[in-house]
């Protein structure tokens, strides 16, 4: 791992969005190598770390989840070796929890969303999280029809012939089973069978396999079903897709139905009614983990009643009614050989510990994040001491390294007894190591305290920031220019040739013109390019001369403005001209424009201030002005279409709702394309008022907003 990453808890929304783009590309690459070619180039643990970082970021920023998120697809898109099957119901992923407190928060969120008091106990099921390959098996008229891998969550590979070789999976269901049944579960290889297979491979002088999960996945994708049959794969059923009729009203009842129909179900599954019982069962499974003949990496909790699952519904990527409680991270000891500083797109200076190579959880670790200057000193973001004796981290120290949800491990603590006598305190740089500009810690306007992050003040003068900004600009959820990847951006940015250099985003759109005017430096003659690839690059650039407003705003790289915030802004202002005018009018940070900006649901004072500061900076205005000469941002209405009667409308809920909780009403409105705001303004389209409505109702009447009852709202949305 050449570069350290900012820890999840220190990411801004903007940084998180960019990191999710990087992770999606990396995981898709490794999925394609493994699932498409059966040629993995990283270990199982390293792959898991990528997935865990992605999940950790999405758990902290759930609104940033994109359509190509690994949590939506878990695996590669079908590679073409097998035919494809579209799942009748998508195979989604679960959110992860890592502590008892996280589990308690999950349970509390269920009660809170449903509007149920804790003394009305809700039952949960708890089952081991099998470390295998997810599978959906479809039966029609009780005969096994098809079997598909999870694939990208929407489309999987047809592995029916290979599934038929797994003796534990019935080919025919009993007479009481519905006409259409999709049973979902996990295909896995027992540890004992894995060890026996590797012993056989070693005896034959062949390369052994890495772990049971990867072996099971590769075995299931064999073109010769006889090979699959020889691998002795097994199956646990725990979920379902399409069902013509439901055989039970609870999760536990469904599992019992699977058992009656002849499917193996996990014997450690329990039905529990309190956080204490859930945690106790987690501990019990953890104690048995080493003795089980199959790999598990946690325990999955689900709300038992299916009607409550339906009410809780889904976030954009995962159910609200389930979570996966992962087992603890692994730790190891090593030595800090050096501390380097990396500069990010927003100027953040992130210290990175260069470590003596050590294996943690099956992965060789050479780098670990040190978060920020305070962390090196043993101080947390709130000013508290984060190590037992408040000691600092120094070059030469023996440290405890942990791998958890992050790709890059963290240095947890220092072994003071092994500290060299010659060690000296690390001095955090006061200037940027890239451009030499002052490095400062900004004061938080709300708390009055210094931010934990030290930032370079160089802006676009700093080559590290400028280059990273271009990478952000061309990224998937911004301008998404095919052919301008990391290597290509590095090449163009570092070039000193006027016909090739790209130092700011507008330079991308003048590249073709500069190439046509040059008689000397032809891009097609440079190693790594060529006539066809150059033509495709220019076509890709020209295809982005018109772009959706939300993508344009996101691409500007405004600090704290991530993909979701950009969508909110595009929906609220409609056109770039209106958006830019509003930012200028809001610059004094008071008045109607400022208040309107702050009233947009999901945008607070910190984000609003960052936006108006961006548009006050002359250098930014100059770059945007040049960009607008090359690119046309399309009005939001021109790129947003929906049959929903409330799509694009702004809705405010006030008073008591009788049919739904406030969270349920908000989730339903947003799923139909509406924007739910927290306060009434001239931009509000509907105010849904229940009993006890107060000042918001008065304000709505004052500014002429349409007011409706809960029943009228439900009639409007067709509920």
From Swiss-Prot:
Pfam families: BRCT (PF00533), DNA_ligase_aden (PF01653), DNA_ligase_OB (PF03120), DNA_ligase_ZBD (PF03119), HHH_2 (PF12826). NAD(+) binds at residues 44-48, 93-94, 127, 150, 186, 302, 326. It is an enzyme of class 6 (ligase). Residues 641-719 form the BRCT domain. Its EC number is 6.5.1.2. Keywords: DNA damage, DNA repair, DNA replication, Ligase, Magnesium, Manganese, Metal-binding, NAD, Zinc. It comes from the Bacteria. It catalyses: NAD(+) + (deoxyribonucleotide)n-3'-hydroxyl + 5'-phospho-(deoxyribonucleotide)m = (deoxyribonucleotide)n+m + AMP + beta-nicotinamide D-nucleotide. Belongs to the NAD-dependent DNA ligase family. LigA subfamily. DNA ligase that catalyzes the formation of phosphodiester linkages between 5'-phosphoryl and 3'-hydroxyl groups in double-stranded DNA using NAD as a coenzyme and as the energy source for the reaction. It is essential for DNA replication and repair of damaged DNA. This is DNA ligase. The lineage of its organism: Bacteria, Pseudomonadati, Pseudomonadota, Alphaproteobacteria, Hyphomicrobiales. The gene is ligA.
């Amino acid at each position: 791992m050449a570069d350290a990453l900012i820890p999840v808890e220190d990411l801004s929304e903007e940084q998180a969005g960019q990191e999710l783009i990087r992770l999606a590309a990396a995981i898709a690459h490794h999925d394609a190598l493994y699932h498409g070619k059966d040629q993995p180039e990283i270990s199982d643990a390293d792959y898991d770390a990528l997935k865990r970082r992605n999940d950790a970021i999405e758990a902290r920023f759930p609104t940033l989840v994109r359509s190509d998120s690994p949590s939506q697809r878990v695996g590669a898109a079908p590679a073409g070796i097998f035919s494809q099957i579209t799942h009748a119901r998508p195979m989604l992923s679960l959110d992860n929890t890592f502590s008892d407190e996280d589990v308690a928060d999950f349970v509390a969120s269920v009660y809170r969303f449903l509007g149920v008091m804790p003394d009305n106990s809700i039952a949960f099921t708890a089952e081991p999280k099998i470390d295998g390959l997810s599978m959906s098996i479809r039966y029609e008229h009780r005969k096994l029809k098809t079997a598909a891998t999870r694939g990208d969550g929407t489309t999987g590979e047809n592995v029916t012939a290979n599934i038929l070789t797994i003796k534990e999976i019935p080919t025919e269901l009993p007479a009481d089973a519905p006409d259409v049944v999709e049973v979902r579960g996990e295909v896995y290889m027992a540890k004992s069978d894995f060890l026996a297979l590797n012993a056989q491979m070693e005896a034959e002088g062949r390369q052994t396999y890495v772990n049971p999960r990867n072996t099971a996945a590769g075995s299931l994708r064999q073109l010769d079903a006889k090979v699959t049959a020889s691998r002795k794969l097994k199956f646990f059923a725990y979920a379902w897709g399409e069902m013509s009729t439901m055989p039970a009203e609870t999760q536990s009842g469904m599992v019992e139905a699977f058992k009656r129909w002849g499917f193996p179900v996990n014997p450690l599954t329990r039905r529990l009614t309190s956080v204490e019982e859930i945690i106790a069962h987690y501990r019990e499974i953890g104690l048995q983990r080493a003795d089980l003949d199959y790999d598990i990496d946690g325990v999955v909790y689900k709300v038992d009643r299916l009607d409550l699952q339906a009410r809780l519904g889904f976030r954009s990527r995962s159910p609200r009614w389930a979570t996966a409680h992962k087992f603890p991270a692994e730790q190891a000891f090593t030595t800090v050989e050096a501390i380097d500083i990396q500069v990010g797109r927003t100027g953040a200076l992130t210290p990175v510990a260069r470590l003596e190579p050590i294996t943690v959880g099956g992965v060789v670790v050479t780098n670990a994040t040190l978060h920020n200057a305070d962390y090196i000193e043993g101080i947390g973001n709130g000013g508290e001491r984060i190590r037992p004796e408040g000691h600092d981290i120094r070059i030469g120290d023996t440290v405890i390294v942990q791998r958890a949800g992050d790709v890059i491990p963290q240095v947890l603590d220092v072994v003071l007894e092994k500290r060299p006598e010659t060690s000296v305190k690390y001095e955090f740089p006061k200037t940027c190591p890239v451009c030499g500009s002052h490095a400062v810690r900004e004061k938080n306007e709300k708390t009055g305290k210094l931010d934990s992050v030290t930032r370079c003040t160089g802006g676009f003068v700093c080559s590290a920031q400028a280059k990273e900004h271009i990478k952000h600009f061309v990224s998937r959820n911004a301008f998404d220019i095919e052919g301008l990847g990391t290597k290509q951006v590095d090449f163009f940015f570092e070039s000193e040739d006027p016909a090739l250099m790209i130092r700011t985003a507008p330079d991308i759109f003048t590249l073709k013109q500069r190439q046509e005017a040059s008689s000397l430096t032809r891009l097609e003659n440079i190693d790594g390019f060529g006539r066809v690839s150059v033509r495709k690059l220019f076509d890709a650039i020209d295809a982005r001369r018109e772009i959706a407003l939300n993508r344009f705003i996101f691409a500007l790289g405004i600090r704290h403005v991530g993909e979701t915030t950009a969508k909110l802004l595009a929906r609220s202002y409609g056109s770039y001209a209106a958006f830019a005018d509003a930012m200028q009018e809001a610059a004094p940070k008071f008045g109607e424009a400022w208040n309107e900006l702050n009233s947009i649901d999901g945008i607070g004072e910190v984000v609003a201030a960052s936006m108006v500061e961006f548009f006050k900076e002359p250098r930014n205005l100059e770059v945007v002005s040049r960009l607008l000469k090359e690119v046309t941002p399309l009005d939001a209405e021109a790129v947003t279409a929906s049959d929903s009667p409330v799509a694009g409308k702004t809705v405010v809920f006030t008073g008591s709702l009788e049919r739904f909780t406030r969270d349920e009403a908000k989730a339903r409105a947003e799923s139909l394309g509406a924007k739910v705001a927290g306060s009434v303004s001239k931009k509000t389209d509907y105010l849904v008022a229940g009993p006890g409505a107060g000042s918001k109702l008065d304000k709505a009447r004052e500014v002429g907003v349409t007011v409706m009852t809960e029943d009228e709202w439900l009639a409007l949305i067709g509920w």
